[in-house]
Swiss-Prot record:
UniProt keyword list: ATP-binding, Chaperone, Cytoplasm, Nucleotide-binding, Stress response
Function text: ATPase subunit of a proteasome-like degradation complex; this subunit has chaperone activity. The binding of ATP and its subsequent hydrolysis by HslU are essential for unfolding of protein substrates subsequently hydrolyzed by HslV. HslU recognizes the N-terminal part of its protein substrates and unfolds these before they are guided to HslV for hydrolysis.
InterPro entries tied to this protein: AAA+_ATPase, ATP-dep_Clp_protease_ClpX, ATPase_AAA_core, Clp_ATPase_C, HslU, P-loop_NTPase
Protein's name in the database: ATP-dependent protease ATPase subunit HslU
Origin species: Rhodospirillum centenum (strain ATCC 51521 / SW)
Amino acid sequence: MTSFSPREIVSELDRYIVGQHEAKRAVAIALRNRWRRQQLPEGLREEVLPKNILMIGPTGVGKTEIARRLARLAQAPFLKVEATKFTEVGYVGRDVEQIIRDLVEIAIGLTRERLRKEVASKAELRAEDRVLEALVGANASGETRQKFRKMLREGQLNDREIEIQVQDTSVQGLPTFDVPGMPGAQMGMINLGDIFGKALGGRTKVRRMSVSESYDVLMAEESDKLLDQEKVVSEAIQSVEQNGIVFLDEIDKITARSEVRGGADVSREGVQRDLLPLIEGTTVNTKHGPVKTDHVLFIASGAFHLAKPSDLLPELQGRLPIRVELKALSQEDFRRILTEPEASLIKQYKALLATEGMTLDFTDDGIDELARLAADINRSVENIGARRLHTVLERLLEEISFTASDRSGESVTIDAAYVRGQLQGLAQNTDLSKFIL
């Protein structure tokens, strides 16, 4: 769990996302409250429930990007999922409880990685012994083993090919099926690979690879042998229950508009009804055991382009008490997006073309013209937010990208005149620009 202060979280998000301070503050406070809750006495800790967030804003203003960056900051089980992927219980498709099952799998992966670090030194010695056995055989003398161990540690044998016995993971890819009549009926998807893996007693197969490649494989195997799998699962479930975060994107797409109800929209409303107990707090059965969702934080977001937030079920609105509106992007925002973030689009294109030996130089008036064009096209055609910059830059640099491999060593300056020359038709003919995306 991250111990960043809200101010630190916002400044971290500022490195990648321009503007939207209200949304950044809301998620920063929510994330910090997770840490604050952990410091409370146990009795009070159970009473403090997370305040779920609803982010509203037009497409392309940074809702999903905030979620992506938050996932890296959270240091907790985090799942980003689209609400449109789910269907009402009883229909063909995935039901919303699958969200928690997926979150548990993510938590198990995170917990295993953390616990592997604790046994890394032991696992490294065991992996080294297995590599030595493959190199010199099981019956080699101690002197020979020591000689090869020294060469191994100095990296002299990294390119040597060896054959090693590793776990056969091919059974893991077998299909899954629902088990009828199990508690909760959705206990779901028992993996045939798990069943066959246990029945076959963990089959092994011989793989041929270089010494350097074998280390990662053997380290993972030996670490897992040293880990208590039950401890991994119980810690992962505890982590989900106390620190889990779910980001529900495109929630506006499952609203039934007030003037159009019936038909397929009933199924959409069904998904909302299924989400109610999940967000409020329920127990979900997974193959690893029951998981309580009382303290899982839900952040929902949607453009609400055709529907309104009030079209959500009133009960669902009540379970998303913190409402944050993200603002549409202006010309000045576009300019900042092109220049300020650590991995801004201009830096990306410069780096890509530098691999061909070309130097790109954007002047200030060239960047201003790009921002103005993007804002104009968004106003006159369809407002798709910052994604419009991808369209404009791809069109602008199309010729340069195509011929870059033949122009190594050249330097190209992109100023306002160059931008107008390349994108003249795009700016003048709005009907034509509809065909770009």
